């Protein structure tokens, strides 16, 4: 037996997907997972589908949040101004975007929000600070009490099909299970399911595996960001192709 899901979110009700389309997508995603196989333990490139990619970027934001930093509970402590991604990576906040899922003119402290870079040319350009956490760190607030608003990860590649071709052989991830991310150390280990890919083509579904790595390594080994952006949340990113993650299976 297999299961999957799909959903639709929009600020404007007229932009919601039709119920029949949501149901059909959920059914199609479930059916294609039938016959899932285990993999032998290996180290291969991993493509995080767009709906999962936002979680990886969310781990970044947890690592640069003021609360974790002043408690010295972050793997990115003292990394401001340092290279943590390849030079082409750009991650920025657009809090005043009309119709954006996370738009807001003011943060939780009442400070006016503004456009800013968090990652520019691969370098950590800003922490994520409220008035309180900024004071604890001896730094000004970045007007991010309550978190980031409308975070964008710029694409440097095509859609998911193009990224599969670029990957060649590896794992396409479509589900992550559990909460095995340690923000203090950056260690990353989660149950997963998806599809085995060879020569850029999906071969068969896989299940009952674990993917593992370290967020610092994952960030630096980012190979591509797709243009297949999942626009349903506060973090807007396409699929993420990351080189050399460990897959634990049989």
Name these PLM-found stretches.
Residues 1-60, 64:
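Internal alpha/beta scaffold segment
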Residues 64-74:
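Mature, solvent-exposed C-terminal subdomains and processed small-chain segments of exported/organellar
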Residues 3-5, 68, 125:
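Intrinsically disordered, low-complexity segments enriched in small/polar residues
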Residues 23, 77-250:
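Dual-mode signal for accessory low-complexity, basic/Gly-rich regions
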